[in-house]
């Protein structure tokens, strides 16, 4: 099983020292904290706030996944050069339709050189 890098696994001191490395690899979930049952919810997953990720033939973000707890929801794949062979922030908009139960969303992303990275979880409460 591959090692999964998560923000909680890394000490505050190491995060500060290697801020660019962690920033460009760790997915961030951006969505409303509340959603309506049966209505589309936009969930944006973005890699990095400040530091762009390379988009080279041998070093790029291969895919981004969205999970609700242990349930796989969606996935987007990228080929090398998807960002024009320039460093940038991979962004994906997923649209999901929530059921009646609250969600605990997590995003995963794979860098071809630095492995599997997991976001912090995002709780979404459901309104009827």
Provide a role label for each language-model segment.
Residues 46-56:
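Short amphipathic, basic-aromatic surface patches that mediate peripheral association
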Residues 2-36:
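Short, compositionally biased P/S/T/A/G/V-rich stretches that sit at domain boundaries
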Residues 40, 100-106:
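Extracellular Ig-like/FN3 beta-sandwich strand-entry sites
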Residues 84-93:
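Aromatic sugar-binding surface patches on proteins
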Residues 73-83:
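Solvent-exposed serine/threonine-rich low-complexity stretches and specific carbohydrate-binding patches
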Residues 110-120:
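Short acidic/polar inter-strand loop motif in beta-rich domains
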Residues 58-74:
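Extended low-complexity, serine/threonine- and proline-enriched intrinsically disordered segments
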